[in-house]
From Swiss-Prot:
Boundaries of every Toprim domain copy: 80-176
InterPro entries cross-referenced by the UniProt entry: DNA_Rcmb_RecR, Rcmb_RecR, Rcmb_RecR_Znf, TOPRIM_dom, TOPRIM_RecR
Pfam families attached to this UniProt entry: RecR_C (PF21175), RecR_HhH (PF21176), RecR_ZnF (PF02132), Toprim_4 (PF13662)
Task of the protein: May play a role in DNA repair. It seems to be involved in an RecBC-independent recombinational process of DNA repair. It may act with RecF and RecO.
Gene Ontology BP terms: DNA recombination; DNA repair
Entry similarity comment: Belongs to the RecR family.
GO molecular function list: DNA binding; zinc ion binding
Keyword rRNA-binding: no
PROSITE patterns: RECR, TOPRIM
Record organism: Levilactobacillus brevis (strain ATCC 367 / BCRC 12310 / CIP 105137 / JCM 1170 / LMG 11437 / NCIMB 947 / NCTC 947)
Superkingdom assignment: Bacteria
Protein name (Swiss-Prot/TrEMBL): Recombination protein RecR
Keyword DNA damage in record: yes
Lineage: Bacteria, Bacillati, Bacillota, Bacilli, Lactobacillales
Coiled coil (residue ranges): none
Length: 199
């Protein structure tokens, strides 16, 4: 049986989201149809506003409404440390911990030969430029996930940054291999930052 075009389009739209297959997309489409019209309108407005009003900070690559983002604009933060993460959501996780008070830099991914993603596809050039322009930065903490791609990216960054005389450290491995920062609890993250090791 073929679905009416509006439902088919809704299913196709949901399937573009990560981790959503045909079954889940169909379930979400029918759930959306059952929602009150006001709720659907509010949801669609929120989607449009997020896409229209949010962009990447020109300094660190975080998601923000203003430029620079509130973290880069905050002069009370420790200007000597930059913690490098894969995605903007990782910053939210680190900030929840309330133990790290330095700056951030978002790579927007990791190097992955399988996906055809090299250093030029990541937000690395702006990190190097930032380090060259800011002599206050004394340490770069690499907080890529403990996956083969995250480790390879960390090693690449270390080799790139160390010759400039900047200390490069890696989060301690309280994070299990293959785990994402996003899913780590606050105490594990705190221990990982505290026990970071020099690369």
């Amino acid at each position: 049986m073929q679905y009416p075009e509006p439902i088919a389009q809704l299913i196709d739209g949901y399937m573009k989201l990560p981790g959503i297959g045909q079954k889940s997309a169909t379930r979400l489409a029918f759930f959306t149809i059952d929602m009150a019209e006001d709720d659907v309108t509010a949801f669609s407005k929120a989607l449009i506003a997020a896409k229209r009003d949010l962009h990447f900070c020109s300094i660190c690559g975080n998601i923000t409404e203003g430029d620079p983002c509130s973290i880069c604009a905050d002069k009370t933060r420790d200007q000597t440390h930059v913690l490098v993460v894969e995605q903007p959501k990782d910053i939210m996780v680190m900030e929840k911990m309330k133990e790290y008070h330095g700056l951030y830099h978002v790579l927007h991914g990791v190097m992955s030969p399988i996906e055809g993603k090299g250093p030029e596809d990541l937000n690395i050039a702006s990190l190097i430029n930032r380090l060259q322009q800011n002599p206050n930065i004394k340490e770069v903490i690499i907080a890529t996930n403990a996956t083969p791609e995250g480790e390879a990216t960390a090693m690449y960054l270390s080799r790139l940054i160390k010759p400039a005389g900047i200390k490069v450290t890696r989060l301690a491995h309280g994070l299990s291999v293959g785990s994402d920062i996003e899913y780590a609890d606050e105490m594990t993250l705190f221990k990982a930052v505290e026990g970071r090791t020099e690369m």
